[in-house]
C-alpha cells in the first residue's frame, strides 16, 4: 500500500510542478480515501488540508519540505518495525492524484465550452486559504493578482469571504487555459447571464437593480 502511494505521489508531484502557479514551491494534491480521514492532523505528514470536495475526496496543499516528509512517511508505511504517529491517516488514503483542468471546469463550462468571442468574462474561484482577512489569505490573493497582471489579465470584480474567494476576469482563450491549469484555482465558471456583480449579492432584497431575473 505504501509503495503504491509513493508511486502515486511521485507522478502527481511531477504533474503539479508543470502547472501554473503564483506561489512557486507550493503544490496542490487530490487525495482519495476510505472511511474517516483525520484532517486535523494531516500536517503530521507534511500536508495541509484545504478543501473537502466529495465524501471521500479532499484537496491538500504541500510545499517541497512537506513533500519530502510525506514521501518518507509513505515509504515507511507497512514496515513492521516502523513507529509512525497518526499512521491511520496514511492507511485511510486510497490514492493521490492532481486537481486538473477538467476538475476546474464548472458544469456550465463543460456543457457550453469557452465563449468564442476574442475577449470574455470568467468567474474564477481560488482555494479558500484560511479566512477572509488572514495574512495567509491576503498573501495568496496578492500573489495571484500579481500573476494576473504579469499575464495581462484584467480583473473586473472580486469577492473575499471566509468560505469563498472569487474573481471576475476578462480573458482571451489562451489566458483562460492558463487559469484552467493554475494550482491556486479551484473552479472556473461562466458568469450568470444576468451579469450580476458580486457587490449586488450582499444588497437588500428591496434594492435589487431592475433587469436581474
Range-by-range predicted roles:
Residues 1-150, 155, 159-161, 182-211:
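Autoinhibitory N-terminal propeptides
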Amino acid at each position: 500500500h505504501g509503495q503504491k502511494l509513493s508511486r502515486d505521489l511521485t507522478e502527481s508531484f511531477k504533474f503539479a510542478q508543470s502547472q501554473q502557479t503564483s506561489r512557486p514551491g507550493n503544490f496542490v494534491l487530490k487525495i482519495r480515501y476510505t472511511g474517516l480521514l483525520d484532517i486535523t492532523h494531516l500536517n503530521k505528514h507534511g500536508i495541509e488540508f484545504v478543501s473537502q470536495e466529495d465524501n471521500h475526496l479532499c484537496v491538500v496543499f504541500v510545499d517541497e519540505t512537506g513533500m519530502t516528509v510525506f514521501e518518507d512517511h509513505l515509504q515507511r508505511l507497512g514496515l513492521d518495525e516502523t513507529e509512525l504517529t497518526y499512521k491511520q491517516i496514511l492507511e485511510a488514503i486510497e490514492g493521490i492524484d492532481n486537481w486538473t483542468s477538467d476538475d476546474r471546469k464548472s458544469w456550465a463550462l463543460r456543457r457550453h465550452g469557452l465563449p468564442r468571442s476574442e475577449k470574455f468574462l470568467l468567474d474564477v474561484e481560488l482555494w479558500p486559504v484560511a479566512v477572509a482577512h488572514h495574512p495567509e489569505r491576503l498573501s495568496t490573493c496578492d500573489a495571484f493578482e500579481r500573476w494576473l497582471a504579469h499575464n495581462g489579465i484584467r480583473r473586473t470584480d472580486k469577492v473575499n469571504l471566509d468560505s469563498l474567494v472569487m474573481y471576475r476576469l476578462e480573458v482571451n482563450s489562451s489566458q483562460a487555459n492558463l487559469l484552467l491549469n493554475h494550482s491556486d484555482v479551484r473552479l472556473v465558471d461562466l458568469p450568470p447571464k444576468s451579469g450580476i456583480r458580486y457587490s449586488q449579492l450582499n444588497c437588500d432584497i428591496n434594492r435589487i437593480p431592475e433587469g436581474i431575473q
